[in-house]
Amino acid sequence: MSDLLGILKQQGQSEEFDAIKIALASPELIRSWSYGEVKKPETINYRTFKPERDGLFCAKTFGPVKDYECLCGKYKRLKHRGVICEKCGVELALAKVRRERMGHIELASPVAHIWFLKSLPSRIGLLLDMTLRDIERVLYFEAFVVVDPGMTELERGQLLNDEAYLDAMEQYGDEFDARMGAEAIRDLLRQIDLEDEIRNLREELPTTNSETKIKKITKRLKLLEAFYESGNKPEWMIMDVLPVLPPDLRPLVPLDGGRFATSDLNDLYRRVINRNNRLKRLLDLNAPDIIVRNEKRMLQESVDALLDNGRRGRAITGTNKRPLKSLADMIKGKQGRFRQNLLGKRVDYSGRSVIVVGPTLKLHQCGLPKKMALELFKPFIFSKLEFRGLATTIKAAKKMVEREESVVWDILDDVIREHPILLNRAPTLHRLGIQAFEPVLIEGKAIQLHPLVCTAYNADFDGDQMAVHVPLTLEAQLEARSLMMSTNNILSPASGEPIIVPSQDVVLGLYYLTREKVNALGEGKIYSSAQEAQNFYEAGHLDIHAKIKIRMPKEDGETGYHLVETTVGRAILAEILPKGMPFDYINRTMTKKVISKVIDSCYRKFGLKETVIFADQLMYTGFKYATRSGASIGIEDMEIPDDKASIIEHADNEVREIESQFRSGLVTNGERYNKVIDIWSRTNELVAKSMMSKIATEEVTDAKGNKVRQESFNPIFMMADSGARGSAAQIRQLAGMRGLMAAPDGSIIETPITANFREGLNVFQYFISTHGARKGLADTALKTANSGYLTRRLVDVAQDVVITEDDCGTDTGILMQPLIEGGDIVEPLHERVLGRVVASDVYIPTQTEPVVKAGTLLDEEWVEKLEKHGVDQVMVRSPITCQTRFGLCAKCYGRDLARGHLVNTGEAVGIIAAQSIGEPGTQLTMRTFHIGGAASRATAANNIQIKTKGVIRLHNIKTVTHENKNLVAVSRSGEVTIVDEFGRERERYKVPYGAVISAQDNSPVEAGQVIATWDPHTHPVISEVSGRLKFVDLIDGITMNRQTDELTGLSNIVIIDAKQRSAAGRDLRPMVKLVTDEGDDIYLAGTNVPAQYYLPVDAIVNFEDGSLVGIGDVIARIPQERSKTRDITGGLPRVADLFEARKPKDSAVMAEVSGLVNFGKETKGKRRLIINVSEDQCHEELIPKWRHISVFEGEHVERGEIIAEGALNPHDILRLLGVGALANYIVNEVQDVYRLQGVKINDKHIEVIVRQMLRKRVITFAGDSKFLVGEQVEESAMLQENDKLLAEGKQIARGTPILLGITKASLATESFISAASFQETTRVLTEAAVSGKVDELRGLKENVMVGRLIPAGTGYTYHQSRKAKRARAAAGGDSSATHTVTASDVEHALSEALNADNHEH
């Protein structure tokens, strides 16, 4: 019994720790771990296969090879436990102690630990203030270092080569001490007085001015303080003793054929021991210095290889030229200890099989093959068999199961009832990739899956496989049932929309069922109920599409009945509607979108149970009527429009016209290309339109004999229209024309495929089709990997974001407005704020009382109210502004999207956010090839046509008035908005430079009016004053070419690229100036800036030197480069760039301060732009000359306004415009990419990630804190320190937020375990060890790795109670925190447990 107690106690020990600390090990500590020294390189005896004594597998040091058996065989059996054999010296214990007992090697000469030497920045180098190169010269015996200068002129740490050393010896004799090798470095480290050094550096810091020096001092200071505070001693970075890994962790296993497979570590250890022993021998023999030195160097190298092979010099290779795997390689990378064993574990009780469709299942069921069930539930069956007395022993039960006796099947039925199982489909990209079902036993060998969960799993039945897992414990079963059951996962956690939505056949069936047909059998009849109509239909007296009237009960709680116009099919559908659901929800043609809306409102109105039943019924009905409809695909169904040939002929003529214009020099090649592409895009649209109108409608005769058009019953049209399968774009390729294709580089090939698939392609057309198809396949493979990596980085950065409190009490938030792009409201306000908590009261102009009070969770009813009152901006709480220290609060997060109520504490919202953003990434990347690479490019926009009536407002647009009275825009970032009579913005458009605006500011405009036009294919250069044109630096043949056209004699002036110019023209800056007739400069209105325009490469000048130019004339035009097709290929890397916060190339220059702009003296290649804030304060920027500067002399700019065009740099946005603007920017940019693909993701997921990117602060003012100016610290750490300082009445530290990319943010997390398991393991662990870091085990990863429940979900309460218990123990010395158990206690507990077991059965 006491033995059992010992085991219980042991198990208890490993559990009870609250944090993990990593530090440097002192030689004493290493010796204390060791059970003996390893003196010989031998492993096992080749004849007896027993471990050699004092060797690498020595049983005396590491423990017995067999349980409780000594090596020589004198003692065997349990009764001698703990005895040490006199003959062979082995202690009798379990053989598994060979996994935990360490040995050690006493090194004859100290060696440096390579991690602290070579891991940049070199820790040893920083401490000694020496360069890595110098230290290496000392360590590898190339130079002497002065350890103690004595009374000489030498300095401590000075390097001497052999000659200098000999000279010094002659000069000073024994007065000084200079040595080589690790011991010299060790002595130098020993001499460092940490306290003294820290004090000196702290005093030196304020007095230094040079940036680099300050950086260096702060680096050193941080390292010294880390050593000082952690209690690590610098000399421990040099090792005298080397620990030896327990032998079972570097095993030697016999293969068949008498050979052995061994871990690489044994080779590496053998080298170290051999060299060490040789060195000992040489030292005993007093060998010559040079030999000893060489041996010491070899010892240093062999220890380096053991710790981190290949870090310095060439990696040591084994027999097969493969580098040996060192200790460092064991822990890093995907196959290392962290990711392979600690974070990824394999499970038992699982099986996998192919899936097939189970259309008869209920939503919570799945079909499980009997064979699998029998195998998976074996232990349950054994215990039941024993319990019922059908088998006496487990062995007998096993036999019965193997014979598959009939009673076994009954018991299996019994065991399986209500025992949920988990189904998982790889890749598991979001939490809906594992769901729980109740198994239904089936014959056959395939798992049956319910069709409605396929969307969540992204499964299809073309050979997909799925894995089954069995939750064993009661808690696991409970969780599976209450949280993971498929019926509990109706809404997608990414967007909050239903994910249990019928698709494909079901949609087609419901669509067919609810369509109307003119003049169908029984049209116009009236029935007393839906049931009666159904009976007539079944009897064959009614067509399913016939328009009829039915007496229906009134809705909205009124009593009585009314007649409803509907069709027979819709009446049938009404039968399965939940009670109380309005009939007009389904009294229409059911497309996929409509069905999704119906399911959504059913969930909101009636809750989970009703919705699940309704969804199932919808599915059964859908399948039934899809079968009845007999819809199929026939070649005849792809109807080619009659006017296709004439449309294409017309396009051919247009293209010929443009070709001839090109030949006569009226347009450039680039313009010609763009125009041709445009013509074919438009033609494709026309053919598609014509084809759709032919396929979509048919002519029929109504009851009165008139010809009418109705929607056709063409199966292909029905499939696309209902949303079951296919799209207009695909039908266009089947029956219209395939259209333009993309070349492998993404550019569009200008000869389109005019044929469609029904007509068939010729060889040339087939060939250019293959580009797209291949590119699609190659992209898929590459991008799947990229997307998976993005998801991994996102999970890593957000893994510890958990809801930890109900309300953090902040009143800040972010301002939400509807997203307006072009004329469309891309996302209305009510969609954006749904499920958020209001941060401050919402008012409307006419009322004094707020419409919505702060702290309200906006649900469907509230947003409807906002919509009704026409509110166009709401301040809502956001994860970005949440004040919770560790984690988030429920109010700032808002609604749990998958459940529809305020989020619960303990919800792991970080992981959900990462999955929601990462999962579609993979989806989208897999989706490129479906259209087969057909180039989809919208015809280039060339005007603004407005959609609503209102008043036009111009926003920061500078215009000049052309002689024909039109306004011409001469600013880049201008916008026009249309506002309604309440002043609410309805439409917003960007106005490009050079657009001709035909309406005045603040003038009323009508819907459909065109208010601006421009040429989409060129960028114009517009004159803002009138005058004579003067060429500067435009020299024929050097900076420009005259391209004369033979046919017309017209010539164009084209600027040559600077890279292609001769040496003479390299530094010339071609530009045009406007001058008066006398040749004086003309200045822009109201400024002293001369009117001059730099001409970029390829610009075409429209006027000759000396011509007269009017205001608003186009002086030159710059052809735009060919357009590339947009798809998520650009998208996924774009998302990654945003989350990594990369600085874009040629990023926009933003104004650092608000003030007036003027230009200073130009330097070579740069312009100096000065912003004057006040008389004495100004800010200068140097901007390269080729950059287009969008502000003019004397203009007023606001801080953060764009001065030079380019991509925005997120770091600048944060610095100049603040956190809110940055959040807005990242959220909108990421959403743009996903929106393009039609993927809905809720904003708050992106906000959670942005919050994690903004965790750090850069200290701007240190106060009395321990921080240094310029240091990066966690916000929570800064707040904690400030709390402490405030309590002591000292000055607090201040810092500004800084943006880190997700990889950097993950590596900069407080938890070193989490960071080390992510990337750059060596660097993270080195840093952590030096500073003696403590991991508080706050996040999810750390807890998974130490084998605990995660502090989220159901594990959250467990962690809370542990925390409370700890606090109690700390406060009152609570005895319950430490258990002392007596043997009798344990016996009592055991007997109780055993009895309880019997009662259960």
From Swiss-Prot:
What cofactor is this protein dependent on? Answer: Mg(2+); Zn(2+)
Q: Where does Zn(2+) 1 bind?
A: 70, 72, 85, 88
Q: Tell me, which GO biological process terms does this entry list?
A: DNA-templated transcription
State if Transferase is listed as a keyword. Answer: yes
Q: State the EC number(s).
A: 2.7.7.6
Catalysed reactions, semicolon-separated: RNA(n) + a ribonucleoside 5'-triphosphate = RNA(n+1) + diphosphate
Q: Which residues bind Zn(2+) 2?
A: 808, 882, 889, 892
Q: Which residues bind Mg(2+)?
A: 460, 462, 464
Q: Which InterPro entries match?
A: DNA-dir_RpoC_beta_prime, DNA-dir_RpoC_beta_prime_bact, RNA_pol_asu, RNA_pol_N, RNA_pol_Rpb1_1, RNA_pol_Rpb1_3, RNA_pol_Rpb1_3_sf, RNA_pol_Rpb1_4
UniProt KW keywords? DNA-directed RNA polymerase, Magnesium, Metal-binding, Nucleotidyltransferase, Transcription, Transferase, Zinc
Which top class of enzyme applies to this chain? transferase
Oligomer and partners = The RNAP catalytic core consists of 2 alpha, 1 beta, 1 beta' and 1 omega subunit. When a sigma factor is associated with the core the holoenzyme is formed, which can initiate transcription.
Name-wise, this protein is DNA-directed RNA polymerase subunit beta'
Q: Which gene underlies this protein?
A: rpoC
